[in-house]
Amino acid sequence: MKIFAMSDIHGCLDAFLDALSLVDLEDKNNKLVLCGDYIHGGFDSYAVVEKIIELKKKYKSKVVVLMGNHEHWVIEQGMPIVDEYRDEGEYDEKRENKCIYFISQMELYYKYKNEVLFCHAGVDEEAGEYWEQGTSDYHYIEKFPPDKGPFCINIVAGHVSTASPYLANNSKFRGIYYDGCSHYYIDGNVLKNGVVPVLMYDTDAKKFYEVMERGNKEL
């Protein structure tokens, strides 16, 4: 099986569609995990969530939709998905409510066996092998700063731009950041770079790749 992952779309529909074009969900051996922060920032937050709803309806369990901190803010703090004062498009109550209902059903993480953990921000790594018992909702969606180094399971997360001083420390970096041990960070700062990076985990080879139009790059 091949598990694809992307994160931090932030209302950028075109970049999301470009990323989706690299994933063949018609292949029975492929699965897609979306790691949160689909909204706020770009002009198409409704359309992004509606596209995810469409994918989930069509492909069912082949598409896993996880919650990010921006979705959590909508559910827990009443923040609107589209705020005209933030110049994010036009508020639409019907679309807002439909998207909020979908957001309320999102999971916090997805685990493939004991090999890979997908989430938005991270886990409480001080809990070690008991991370599932020791990790709060806050860690899954808001953890900061990002961890690096060896851990008992591979972590795939977004939340922090891979170009940031906490990861690649390179303002021109726009791809997937691998720390050389157990962490794969996939937030490519779409609002700046216009790109949603796509990660792929080959469960047979147990290898990670960055998926691009020109081919896959092993991480």
Residue ranges of predicted features:
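Active-site neighborhood of divalent metal-dependent phosphoester bond hydrolases
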Residues: 41-114, 118, 140-146
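Divalent-metal (often Zn2+) His-rich catalytic cores of metallo-beta-lactamase-fold enzymes
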Residues: 117-133
